């Protein structure tokens, strides 16, 4: 079993670009068919580690979904980010959905 460093709804930073992001899905290993998208995907070590679907905002404030290796991410200090409130709202919404009891028939 592979343990992931980050969880759903957690806010993270891209280590190289510094962009704030929110984890929306986790894969135990690289799972895209096209390895030419990212040089990190060609590394066997990185391919075998967890990969994350992360929603971020680019320099223009546009929302983008990225697929990043665990090694490309760092922890983000919990708290509000007034410069990117939509990412705070997304993170809170995901965490709330994970904690809410599910209705059963």
Curated annotation (Swiss-Prot):
Keywords: Cytoplasm, Stress response. The keyword Cytoplasm applies. Pfam families: YccV-like. One of its GO terms (cellular component) is cytoplasm. One of its GO terms (molecular function) is DNA binding. Belongs to the HspQ family. Involved in the degradation of certain denaturated proteins, including DnaA, during heat shock stress. This is Heat shock protein HspQ. It comes from Erwinia tasmaniensis (strain DSM 17950 / CFBP 7177 / CIP 109463 / NCPPB 4357 / Et1/99).
